[in-house]
Amino acid sequence: YKGMYRDLTNHTVELRVWTGAEWQWMHCRLYGKEFPEDGQLMSPSVVYEHPYTMLQVPVKEVVQDASGIKERIAAKRNVCGVQFGTKDVFAVASVLTADGKETAVRYFKGGKRYSDQCQRVVDHIDKSHASHGENGKGPVNQRYWMQIKHLNSHYAHQISREIVEYCKAHEVGIIAFPKYAESYEKHVKKASGNYSALHLSTRIREYLTYKAWQSGILVIDINAKGLHENCAVCGANIVSVDKKTQECTCEAGHTTNRYLNTARNTAKRCLAQFQKKQKASETAG
């Protein structure tokens, strides 16, 4: 409530706390998402979530475009299919018009740089463990783990921002992601390693969702079943996948990046799914 906090910024806040004898102002440092520049900050609340004390701040924002999916499909807005990748590629995006024509493709890279930076920090942690034994697991390495945390946050914000800006530049109204089974996602992430490009996919998606919402772009999930099995160019079955080059080839001989193929199919399925619903609604009406 007003009077119980003051000087709230992205990184600090002062809270009025009861010590048991008197009220005092306590200076606190904050870690987490940046507050939106155009947002109106509401009264924060302190919530304890073991082992952290969290400051939750409601934000009131004006959304540029509050229309729903049906309205955007009816208005023939562009759709962007996004598939997360591995190695150097964080994500691949394919932009389609309402009639299914591809107008733009982009690979969002930087995964190798992210992995290398994380690995250098992990090497420091391992050396500290070897030098300090049990003590190396405590405060000695706290600053290194904070570096890992900051790297995760930095790259997740950077890639999510790049995707949203790319979609804005291509007048995208809907961003579609393939939705996989939770067990499958865990298996793939475990196989890719702790500090791979795919390791950040969940956080990138989280940051991207609210950034897109602020820009008037909807983010939705599309059932991923079978998206990787067919060629996005001709619809033929995929018959081979080269995991070294990440290329896939269909029965008709079309060869393309397998993540791009899935991104294209995701955008296509999104269009087909909601255009079908639109036609059914018009027929019923």
Predicted segments — roles?
Residues 53-285:
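Positively charged, helix-rich recognition surfaces that bind polyanionic ligands
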Residues 1-52:
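Acidic carboxylate diad motif detector
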